[in-house]
Amino acid sequence: MILRNDIKDLPQGIDAAERDVFYQDSDYLLREIFIREKGKGNALNEGIRLARNDLVCVLDADCILQEDALSKAVKHFQNDEVAAVGGRLLVKREDSCQLEAIQFCEYMKTFQLSRRIFARLNAQCLISGAFGVFRKSTLLGMNGYDIDTVGEDMELVLRLQEQDYRQSKKQIVYDPTAVCYTGVPHSIKRLLHQRDRWQRGLMDCLIKHHNLIANPHYGLLGLVTMCYQLVVELLGPVFWVIYTVLLIDKNMFPLFSVVFAGYALVQIGLTIFAAYIDIEKNKWSLLKWMPKLILTTLEEMVLQIPIMVVRVVGMITFHWRRLVW
């Protein structure tokens, strides 16, 4: 099933109903359904409701699955305790521009390090909306995605985790071998707009599920994952902006330069370590790409300055721009 959301002009011959079956091919079991400007959450919920099988795959329109991604994700559901499986996102290299390369390194660190760590702790708070597989019964039992947020993917997983701790424990699995290639912004403007939305979605989810933060009742999810999301992901941009402003002070410049150099070394180390985990060839391949990895990481750090500013602005304007996509 293919869902198209926010379509303003339907093809000729399609009536203006809120939900329309535009294309159906029985040979491939494909149905294409248009949802008229109701938001991503509504479109996903309609797809879940109309799905005919026990498992539902959520996939963004700009994503391409690796040939064996679905089979690798689905095998986990042989275990009845598994409620959802998230795959690994890789950047789809289209234009080979430097901005794309920077995001490639960023995604590599995110999915090869932090997602793996949280999965090992059984304390995941997010299955990316770009690619995830769920039991239909689980989604229906939770009334689907929350339509009152732009962070619907994170909110769903937090609600699932909270529900599982209250009732029977279900597993949320991260499979790094189930690979999905996703498109990324090719301009600074679009990238900043994306990160602004992500920040508002994160803030919304932490407000809605504030009871999980530092709550030992929810195990490592509350004590580690949620604290990390609050301190590093939500408040981190505030600290970064303050740090950047303090760099202007000549008296503070030497100290903060040392801190920046240390931070740069840590980031370079994380990038190389993530690449080492990711590499499928021999160690010489890693050595060959190491100069480019180091350069790209340094460029990523420079790019973080406007990104952090935009994220702080997103937090400041949260109350009147909460649902702006």
What are these regions (language model features)?
Residues 63, 130, 150-157:
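Conserved glycosyltransferase catalytic-site signature
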Residues 77-115, 147-150, 157-228, 306, ...:
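Catalytic donor/gating beta->alpha subdomain of glycosyltransferases that bind UDP-sugars
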Residues 59-61:
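Active-site acidic Asp-centered loop
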Residues 228-319:
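Membrane-embedded multi-pass helical conduit in multi-pass membrane proteins
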Residues 56:
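Short aromatic/hydrophobic "clamp" motif used to bind/position activated sugar donors
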